Amino acid sequence: LMDYLRMAERAGMDMSQDAVRWPKDLRAAHDRALAAELAVMADNNEYAASFREMSKRCAGLAWEKDGICIRVAERPSELVQEGNVLHHCVGGYSQSHAQGKIILFIRHSRRPDRSWYTLNIDTRTKKVIQLHGYGNEWANGKALKINKKVLAFVDDWRREVLDKWMLPQKPKKKEKAG
């Protein structure tokens, strides 16, 4: 219980609420507090500013077609959340994203907040590094196939958006007038 309470406090949870202080399911509350704490830490890690800058530079990669949309991850905590929901390891890719091997989220247009597929590309070579859905396409010991509509969407997106896109230059740091 003490471990959970420390994590909940560090994650910024409202400790005045009885439901936070005395959860009905301690294991589930512990897991939620851990995920929240990791998300807070991710948004404040040494790569967070570079991550957000790279995301802004790549905003032009957002696109929508036939009920599917794609957008760039905006904050490191989104990677942690994505990894938790889809049960894959994207949560540890903050540094890679900040360095140009970016993470994009593929969603149903009607549910853009709901995790579906995660795409990793190299902005310099414009190559797809990996595309994964739930559990890296493994469930109950069986390999699953990536949805054909998603594969077609990624092919169309590559042709219509990625191939024509150029990574904008880093914004120059403003010099202080002295």
Question: For each predicted feature, which ranges?
Answer:
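Glycine-focused motif/segment detector
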Residues: 1-178
